From Swiss-Prot:
The lineage of its organism: Bacteria, Bacillati, Mycoplasmatota, Mycoplasmoidales, Mycoplasmoidaceae. This is Elongation factor G. Its main location: cytoplasm. Belongs to the TRAFAC class translation factor GTPase superfamily. Classic translation factor GTPase family. EF-G/EF-2 subfamily. CDD domains: EF-G (cd01886), EFG_III (cd16262), EFG_mtEFG1_IV (cd01434), EFG_mtEFG_C (cd03713), EFG_mtEFG_II (cd04088). NCBIfam families: EF-G (TIGR00484), PRK12740.1-5 (NF009381), small_GTP (TIGR00231). It comes from the Bacteria. InterPro entries: EFG_II, EFG_III, EFG_III/V, EFG_IV, EFG_V, EFG_V-like, EFTu-like_2, G_TR_CS. GO terms for biological process: ribosome disassembly. GTP binds at residues 17-24, 81-85, 135-138. It holds the Pfam family EFG_IV. SUPFAM superfamilies: EF-G C-terminal domain-like, P-loop containing nucleoside triphosphate hydrolases, Ribosomal protein S5 domain 2-like, Translation proteins. One of its GO terms (molecular function) is GTP binding. One of its GO terms (cellular component) is cytoplasm.
């Protein structure tokens, strides 16, 4: 079977935004105007195609990323709609890892919001080209120019309007294309009735100014265009579009469009921008991989190469079981074939291949380079693992996921629920790398940990609905961490003689702080002081021991451990002995390396009417918060602050109380920071 769509006509893109900016509504309109669906479902009615989970329909928010495919102007578009709530940031992370482009959706009244900044940073980390869609131009308080300014100031990027709205709020009735200098007026809420007219007189000067600014900006990215511009030559429309496309692909230029997804205004022009400016798989740099010799190689998108793909998501389907979503970077994968999981060095059979449309499946025979699909039949492959054919032994770059910041205890209501709960937790943890479950060694309770109260609430609800498990839950707890503040060289020695073969493991390890870099293990053994087969057990022993820190038993993070010396016994040494020796070394380091307790710090933005500004500032300060700035927005005050998560429980209720229900806030994880001594003493006392 040959390729039906040329690779240069593929677009793999996602839609990302702050919650309530209109991502899913934009996705629904893309499906409708591209002919993929024939009836529009609204998010607020619980009828959108892309929000298919029961919890999504009930709450009117996106919880899991949903994939679909549409066609537009001879191009095949793979679209992934991602959540906007910070608790589900894992869905954005793994989607951006495999996408070639993205649409960043903004609320025209709010401009850049906290989660906008978060997803923008995620996209920048993976160097994902983006176009920006200022949505909700029909909303009260909508301001396109202010939104563009917020992009430039808060995101610090070259954001240049290529469209301008005709009117705003209730008077929003058209869009001016800055590139072509054409105006499009909308008849009611049906974009197919858009009428091209001359630019209204009151906008002519504004458009000319924006056009000159646009040409100057794109000319700075294209030498020939710059020469023509300086010589006063007329600039062709295609030349401008090509320069914009080149700038977008290299993440040096971010075109800004506008519209109202809910009112069907600007969606077709947005689809045109996806085709015109976002890259195909052959336009982006080749994927990087590490071969068996630990050398970096490039994976070029080609059907003729050996198969290599990345599993970026695992989901449980009630009808077909485990679904593994993959992006194919090279080669062809056929239904019924075998793939190799490189990390686990294990072969698995591909039972079936399906293209997804939200929760609906369309079975296909094969998937080719540059495309995205779901695989049925893979039992052991998890998120971030590389799949290849037998001829390749390379691994694509893995994904990095945030550590959980909140936890709570769960227990089955009946004995019959016990086994079902274990199965449910295991499957949910397979799906979500930011969801952790473990047993408290002191109480024996099962603890679940995640990115926020809503995250855990949804997971508990899924246990009840999907797995029929009834559980009791405890109060939410902060997920503290421990680390070292100073450097020390320590020794760990495990020697046991009790008749017969003994145990012998001996290590010398240098421990030092490794701020914001996680755990790093360095092997500096030379001259065979410790045989190679015992190096990995030393690392494993440290990783296991780091699950319980020396201060209060919390997991340890941000530590660099350098194994530089040690010894072994020809007969008595074993992997277990070196694991224990490593754990003893860490225990000794806990006495010498100045261990400290870390607490999660949250970035919050509080919006309150002017008269409650003082009370709000005082309340934040009383919670150990640090005010980072304030901003006047229309008739309300916006307060930005960093506050320990420990102090934020119950904040929603308190804010409603002292603002008479007129205040609101958003919160997201910022970083871990050292906990004050007084708080540490309280926490340690409570743990005893």
């Amino acid at each position: 079977m040959s390729r039906t769509v040329d690779l240069k006509n593929f677009r793999n893109f996602g839609i990302m935004a702050h919650i309530d900016a209109g991502k899913t509504t934009t996705s629904e309109r893309i499906l409708f105007h591209s002919g993929r669906i024939h009836k529009i479902g609204e998010t607020h009615d619980g009828e959108s195609v892309m929000d298919w989970m029961e919890q999504e329909k009930e709450r009117g928010i996106t919880i899991t990323s949903a994939a679909t495919s549409v066609s537009w102007k001879n191009c095949s578009l793979n679209l992934i709609d991602t959540p906007g709530h910070v608790d589900f940031t894992v869905e954005v992370e793994r989607s951006l890892r495999v996408l070639d482009g993205a649409i960043a959706v903004l609320d025209a009244q709010m401009g850049v919001e906290p989660q906008t900044e978060t997803v923008w940073r995620q996209a920048s980390r993976y160097e994902v080209p983006r176009v920006i869609f200022v949505n909700k131009m029909d909303k009260t308080g909508a301001n396109f120019e202010r939104s563009v300014l917020s992009i430039q100031q808060r995101l610090g990027v070259k954001a240049v309007p290529i469209q301008f709205p005709i009117g705003a709020e209730n008077d929003f009735n058209g869009i001016i294309d800055i590139i072509t200098k054409k105006a499009y007026f909308f008849d009611g809420n049906k974009e197919e009735n858009a009428i091209e007219k001359p630019i209204p007189e009151q906008y002519v000067d504004q458009v000319e100014k924006l056009y000159n600014n646009l040409v100057e900006e794109v000319a700075s990215l294209d030498d020939q265009l710059m020469a023509d511009y300086l010589d006063g030559k007329p600039i062709e429309i295609d030349a401008i579009k090509n320069a914009i496309r080149n700038g977008v692909i290299h993440c040096k230029f971010f075109p800004v469009l506008c519209g109202s997804a809910f009112k069907n205004k600007g969606i077709k022009l947005l689809l045109d921008a996806v085709v015109d400016f976002l890259p195909s798989p052959v336009d982006v740099p080749p994927a990087k991989a590490i071969d068996a010799n630990n050398k970096e190689i490039s994976i070029k998108a080609s059907d003729d190469a050996n198969f290599i793909g990345l599993a970026f998501k695992v989901a449980t389907d009630p009808f077909v079981g485990r679904l593994t979503f993959i992006r194919v970077y090279a080669g062809v994968l056929k239904s019924g074939s075998y793939v190799k999981n490189v990390r686990k060095n294990k072969k698995e059979r591909v039972s079936r291949l399906v293209k997804m449309h939200a929760q609906n499946r369309n079975e296909i025979d094969e998937i080719r380079a540059g495309d995205i699909c779901a695989v049925i039949g893979l039992k052991d492959t998890t998120t971030g693992e590389t799949l290849t054919d037998d001829k390749l032994d390379v691994q694509l770059e893995a994904m990095q996921f945030a550590e959980p910041v909140i936890s709570l205890a769960v227990e089955p209501k009946t004995k019959a629920d016990q086994e079902k709960m274990s199965i449910a937790l295991s499957k949910l943890a397979e799906e979500d790398p930011t969801f952790k479950t473990f047993s408290d060694p002191e109480t024996g309770q099962t603890i679940i940990a995640g990115m926020g109260e809503l995250h855990l609430d949804i997971l508990v609800d899924r246990m009840k609905r999907e797995f029929k498990v009834e559980v009791n839950i405890g109060a939410p707890q902060v997920s503290f961490r421990e680390t070292f503040k100073s450097t020390s060289e320590v020794e760990g020695k495990y020697i046991k003689q009790s008749g017969g073969r003994g145990q012998y493991g001996h290590v010398k390890i240098r421990f030092e702080p490794n701020k914001d870099k996680g755990f790093e293990f360095v092997d500096k053994i030379v001259g065979g002081r410790i045989p190679r087969e015992y190096i990995k057990p030393v690392q494993t022993g440290l990783e296991n021991a780091m699950n319980s820190g020396p201060l209060a038993g919390y997991p340890m993070i941000d530590i660099k451990a350098t194994l530089f010396d040690g010894s072994f016994h020809e007969v008595d040494s074993s992997e277990m002995a070196f694991k224990i020796a490593a754990s003893l070394a860490l225990k000794e380091a806990g006495k010498q390396c100045n261990p400290v307790l870390l607490e999660p710090i949250m970035a919050i933005e509080v919006t309150v009417p002017e008269q409650y500004f003082g009370d709000t500032m005082g309340d934040i300060s009383s919670r150990r918060g640090i005010i980072e700035g304030t901003e006047q927005r229309d008739n309300v005050q916006l307060i930005k602050a960093k506050v320990p998560l420990k102090e934020m429980f119950g904040y929603a209720t308190d804010l409603r109380s002292f603002s008479q229900g007129r205040g609101n806030y958003v919160m997201q994880f910022s970083h871990y920071a050292e906990t004050p001594k007084s708080v540490v003493n309280e926490i340690i006392a409570n743990k005893k």
